[in-house]
């Protein structure tokens, strides 16, 4: 992502969006926008707009954050060890904007690969399936066909 475009987008973020994506913050469980979202659509990086997750891979993990079994395209996310807060976890970031998204854990549904991408709502923007064309994400409609 172009640095000047990224800086422009960062200025538009709310405090919680900035804290989560740029300072690796975490929003409160069960008190965020998408933890119980049941609508069909895709989730894009709040900074870059790159598609990251689909509602077709979302499930209720009971943790209080949106949880997914996989990203839409693994090339759009990167992972690295996170040793903060006295734990060893795997952080998930977006490739294009380098936004902190959340963490991935090996306790997801076994029949779907066994991973749980536990993602902060504040790092995401939801595009409902009926708005994909309007928002320029028409290529992702095939996920829902």
From Swiss-Prot:
SUPFAM superfamilies referenced in this protein's UniProt entry, alphabetically: Mss4-like
Assigned EC number: 1.8.4.12
Gene3D superfamilies given in the database record: Peptide methionine sulfoxide reductase
Domain MsrB residues, every copy: 6-129
Pfam families, alphabetized: SelR (PF01641)
Top-rank EC class of the record's enzyme: oxidoreductase
Annotated GO CC locations: cytoplasm
Active site as annotated: 118 (nucleophile)
Keyword Oxidoreductase: yes
Domain of life per record: Bacteria
Catalysed reactions listed for this entry: L-methionyl-[protein] + [thioredoxin]-disulfide + H2O = L-methionyl-(R)-S-oxide-[protein] + [thioredoxin]-dithiol
Listed InterPro entries: Met_Sox_Rdtase_MsrB (IPR028427), Met_Sox_Rdtase_MsrB_dom (IPR002579), Mss4-like_sf (IPR011057)
Keywords annotated in UniProt: Oxidoreductase
An annotated Gene Ontology molecular function: peptide-methionine (R)-S-oxide reductase activity
An example Gene Ontology biological process: protein repair
Membrane-spanning residues: none
PANTHER family on file: METHIONINE SULFOXIDE REDUCTASE, PEPTIDE METHIONINE SULFOXIDE REDUCTASE MSRA_MSRB
Family listed: Belongs to the MsrB Met sulfoxide reductase family.
Protein name: Peptide methionine sulfoxide reductase MsrB
Taxonomic lineage: Bacteria, Bacillati, Bacillota, Bacilli, Bacillales
């Amino acid at each position: 992502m172009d640095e000047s475009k990224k800086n422009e987008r960062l200025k538009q973020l709310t405090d919680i969006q900035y804290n989560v994506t740029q300072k690796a913050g975490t929003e409160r469980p069960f008190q965020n926008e998408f933890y119980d979202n049941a609508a069909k659509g895709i989730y894009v990086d709040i900074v870059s707009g790159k598609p990251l997750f689909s509602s077709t891979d979302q499930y209720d993990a009971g943790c209080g954050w949106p949880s997914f079994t996989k990203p839409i395209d693994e090339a759009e996310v990167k992972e690295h060890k996170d040793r903060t807060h006295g734990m060893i976890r795997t952080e998930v970031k977006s490739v294009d904007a380098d936004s902190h998204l959340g963490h991935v854990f090996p306790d997801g549904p076994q029949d779907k690969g066994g991973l749980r991408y536990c993602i902060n709502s504040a790092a995401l923007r939801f595009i409902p399936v009926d708005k994909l064309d309007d928002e320029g994400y028409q290529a992702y409609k095939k996920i829902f066909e």
